[in-house]
Amino acid sequence: MKIMGVAKRHAIKLLRRAVGLPTGDLDIVGRLDGFENDVVHGWAHWPRQKGRRVIVDIFAGDVFVCERAADMLRDDLAANGIGDGRHGFDVKIPPAFSRGAKTRIRVRPVTDAPLELTASDERALFARRISRDDYLRATFAEAFDSERERAAPAAPQPSQKTELLFAPTPVSSPPPVLGEALCAYLDQNRYKWDLADKFDATLSIADREAFLAHYVEFYGRARRPLRIPLSARDIEFLNEGPTPQERLAPSRAMRLFAQTPGEDARDDERLAAIFRWAAFGAAAFNVEDCLIASAHEDALRHCDDADIPFPLSTFMKRFLDAHPMLRGANVARESERRAAYFAILLFAARAPHYLRFVPADWLAAYLSPRAGAAPFEDESRRLFGAGGVTIARWRAAIDALGYDDEAKRFRTRTPSGHRAHSAALPAPAGETVDIQLIGPFSRQLGIADSCRALAAALQQLDYSVRLCDFTLDYPNRIRADAVPLPTSPARAKINILHLNLEELPSAIAYLPDIWSQGRLVGFPYLEMPTPHPAQMLGLALVDELWSASDFTTQALAGHRPCHTVGTSARPARRRGRGAARARVYEDIAGADDFVFLASCDALSGAFRKNPLGTIRAFLAAFPNDAKVKLVIKTHSVDRVRAERETNVWRSIRNIVAECERVLLIDRILDDDEQMALIEGADCYVSLHRAEGFGYHMLEAMALETPVIATAYSGNMGFCDEQTAFLIPYRLIPVGPGEYPRTRGDQLWAEPDFTAAVDAMRAVFGDRDLRERKVAAARVIAETQFSTEAFARRLDARIEDILSRRR
């Protein structure tokens, strides 16, 4: 970690002082480390001012985004002797300001000379001095955009679905010991992210604290700028600490997430810590809307000199003093106090919770015209000229951030006191359609293909249909041919959430609350014969379930009404085996080679998809035949993180390196290439241990490619002895690390090795048998799994639902 040399910095400082130029920027060291996934990372430090944190202003282009204290602990800073290591910052750039990777990020430490952090730590030889007014003009000149900050329509009242997120968890467990049971959403989060063995909030208060600390710090920061769900009890628990006798005692949230003074600290030290948390710390954790204790709000709102016009509260005074460009004002003068109000209201346009610390009556007076313009508008014209910030545009800015200025609170709080992001979202505009389909349309994964198949079938029917792209928690790559779709739904008579059950609660938590007037249908895939605790809340939230296979229906029927509606294969454009092979196999297989193909998304699980088992069977079936090859098609191996999974892929790469008849394709193919890959193979192999449905097997049947498949799970809706070479199996326990959120009682199939070897040899050697199965399979694919057949099944179920509304 290289920073500008002390000698060079000192020489520049002496030169500037000699000619009367500012030197404040030379007292700061720091760097902009990078900008990735809309998060800006960096650090800034004042070596000569121990314990003081640098304040940084973050810009996207020329637009001010927010102000933060550089106070995040970074181990690399501590290891390199950079102060106490608490000098980092990371800020999520909200979508309203972001242009993705094209966003030009600027980070300016607040000092009396212009300074912008870069990848180096160099300083200019000369610098101009800036005044308070210059600073405010430069910071807020482009901050108010009428389009970006248009006032939002009122949010609807939270529905019963939203309230269910905060109900008792549907997962049965022993009664609490000394701790408390988590609400449904937080408990589901614990199971979803494989934290159940690490955290049990029911055991003790300390255990409850530990989970909530992890939830807010890691899950909450990852979700920024979305507001993660917190129950009213969670909020009360985290705000506990201050009492009528000790109103300045730190809250539990402060103790968990911030630096707090010791028990023998003076009141001024405690108040300073409360101010730092309220001004910067809570916002850094995205909890400023709910985790500032009410006793602390009262203390920060207090005015020592309440009898004078436009008095400054404790918060306002400390904010001015903490801010290098605002401190030093002569607040004994009313004009300076009015200017201070204006400065703080400008910052409140990016941090609306500041308004809770401004005296309410005087804030109203500042925004109200008396014998002319309001004081706000007077100060705006003085600072920005005739085209300055209007009160209407300022109100629109705070409204866009979900703050209700009349109620003096954020709209994220429900009438029950819970915190829900959906509660702050505006009521959706547009007509009520018959059917709304919500799912990860734009992603490169199986359920996205299923979304498109479902959409195609629905659009054949005589109903109004709206499609909505929902990709939260789907890290898969974006399809190159993805069609832009709305990401925010509106109202519908039937809402279909085509998501995995463990992802479904996130749709309720983070989408507008549109669920109260329509029927909510979940359309999940299930790979295990019983649902996992992470999937139980998803089941509780829906009114009914649709499934593509009887396997899923049987697994879920005891939890919600479940209807098998099936699905459809993508329309097959047959080009002939020779042309298909030339399209994608040109460099790896000749025209007269016999090619077995197995495929899987590496993020779908190497143990579940079992490519290594396929390789074992292939090499046992054909140990030496140079004209028989196996192609393993995958993608995203570089994104696999689980150790046991990476070990499997490392072993596969080793085999590929040592055996020229086993080939690996690790890249995303477009739909045309994928179809050619399947059609150009002589046999498609799926020795899976569990399968939600098995689209590639069905597509192989439609393309007249023989199929070898494990006789278990979702594919059995179209695989039988007439259509496929079925491999018998035995049920075995799912091993640790072999499947997400593995439980000891979960079972899946272990395909019979000898049968798999025999099936490969049969496909290769018995042409008549191969062709009989291919012909039968094609009939099934075209008659039962066409878009038209799928549409007919859907129509029957939809008509039944809508007829009950009439």
Summary of predicted features, one role per range:
Residues 3-226, 237-246, 256, 260, ...:
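Basic, ligand-binding patches in group-transfer machinery
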Residues 107, 324-326, 330-331, 415-427, ...:
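Extended catalytic core of nucleotide-activated donor transferases of GT-like folds
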Residues 449-457, 465, 573-674, 679-680:
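Conserved catalytic-core segment of nucleotide-activated headgroup transferases in glycan assembly
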Residues 682, 704-706, 711:
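A short alpha->beta transition loop at the rim of the catalytic pocket in nucleotide-sugar-dependent
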Residues 689:
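Aromatic "clamp/platform" in nucleotide-sugar-dependent glycosyltransferases that forms part
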Residues 755-762, 769-783:
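A short, well-ordered alpha-helix in the C-terminal region of glycosyltransferases
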Residues 787-806:
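C-terminal alpha-helical cap of glycosyltransferases
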